[in-house]
Amino acid sequence: DLRMSRGLGDVYKRQEKMMDKNAIKKFAVWARTELIARVSLKGVEYGITEDNIEDANADSVGGKVLTADEKKQRQALIAEINDKGYKQVMEEVAYTWFNRFSALRFMEVNGYLPSHVRVFTDEENSFKPQIITEAIHLDLDGLDVEKVYELKDAEKTEELYKYLLIVQCNALNKILPGMFQRLSDYTELLLPDNLLREGSVIQQMIELIPEDDWKDAVQIIGWLYQYYNSEKKDDVFAALKKNVKITKENIPAATQLFTPDWIVRYMVENSLGRLWLEGHPDVKSQLLPTEEEQSAYSTGNRDPEDTKWHYYLEETEQEPEVQVQLAEIRKEYAALTPDQLKVIDPCSGSGHILAYMFDVLMKIYESYGYTTREAVASIVENNLYGLDIDDRAAQLAYFAVMMKARQYDRRFFSRGIQPHVYAIAESNYVDKFAVDYFCNGDMKLTAAMDTIISELHDAKEYGSILTVTPQDWSALYDRFAEIKEDIHISRGAALRGLLPLVQTAETLAQKYDTVVTNPPYMGSAGMNSKLYDFVKEEYPDVKSDMSTVCMRKTISMCNEHGYMAMINIPVWMFISSYGKLRTEIITRNSLVQMLHLSLIH
């Protein structure tokens, strides 16, 4: 059922509640430059510039005597700069605060903050942070009320605000550890000054981006992220023209692209949605629109309560022998229950596809008779998986899934459930003592960890195209549970360094019923030598572009009768170098639908 479709995207564009993308882009591009400048200025205050760093053990800098905390934070910052370089650290601190500001704004607008106190605005959305006026009444973990009184009495409003902001971020670590990690000492040290002034990053975020754009639309986080990176992406490609290859650190900026909403809906509905409906045709009336509903949707008269699958395409009539084969496959689908489904976006970016997979899974669970609360918990625990090489993107994808869960279940944050959405971890700097402690002389654990460590070396270079050996995952997780309350000196290093490796390995090793993704696009000319050599060795038939490498890989991630849906460069259909890929797809797999985007205007 191959369709060369024209104008399908226009259907969605006519009815979509349009975000002000120009405002979002204007803010995000400006915010990156502004935040890097502001955190760098804080560095100067502590005797740290790109060209010079004053003594790490100094008790005072520029005539200012350092507190014990400031001295410790400054030493941590200097150590990080010595390890990663000045520019990289300033970039990381800037985007850390950008991510947090964006997440806090989304949560306050949607009423998701557990404190129910706005961080940036008052109830009328004016730039008068409610958290300041309610400071002495706040119920936040870690809040020093005496310090609050002290700062209020001294009328140090800016200092009070920075303190409350840090306490709020650290308090959210309890429910959103994947987004609000405990702030590194130096990250806190470099929080910009004058956040309450006219023209600050926070004030501009409130003024430039309409409040409605944040409401029930977690994809705004993805747009912010893409636009924030746009200048860096331009720099990477400008360097590429001068034959400077794309480094491991710059692969995310060079390859990530936010997927338009209608394309996400089309891919997810016709893969995950199709798999379910083919096994459970009796619920079609619950999940698919009537002709009248589809007509209204297409003309822009959309009911906000309408969550049916408007991009689902019914199959055309098949040949008799094909119908026999499909009947056998559909028996397998019919035996599936919602909690058995496993779906993944292996190049998840900021989580747009994962967020819509969540919506589609909710409809599936509801049609099967689950309560909303049961469905949300099961989706997060059993169904949904996401991976990305970029820590920032994975953080935002994690946040998107958690916000979806909170949207459906207002008490979700209290349930202690965390999603399977991870930044791909690499094993380059594993602590040998932590490995020895974790394995504890157990030969099976030792063999498993040795294999995982070997296979995930330089994993951030290769991402989800790595092939990982299945292990006894239960035994590994049982050991993590065992050491959780241990007091051994290596316990922390094992949990911090080894658990992410095991989570990454398991996610890469298992098979899925549906794989949906928008892969990275990078021609072989842009690959650095290490990545190119790996691709040439492991994926020789599709080595010309990372997107076709991902095409081959995602097919192998599917169960025997699973679905893969992805966007890709059209040349794989035509040029001779992709002949083997075409033959493999035709002989070993089945094409259900194809949408040629070049025909869409």
Give residue ranges: language-model regions.
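Single conserved hydrophobic/aromatic residue that forms the stacking wall/gate
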Residues: 1-15
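Intrinsically disordered, low-complexity segments enriched in small/polar residues
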Residues: 7, 60, 140, 176, ...
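Polar low-complexity intrinsically disordered regions enriched in Ser/Thr and small residues
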Residues: 10-12, 145, 303, 466
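Non-catalytic, mostly N-terminal accessory regions of nucleic-acid modification and defense proteins
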Residues: 13-283, 402-421, 426
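SAM-dependent methyltransferase catalytic region
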Residues: 242-249, 253-593
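RNase H-like polynucleotidyl transferase catalytic core
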Residues: 592-600
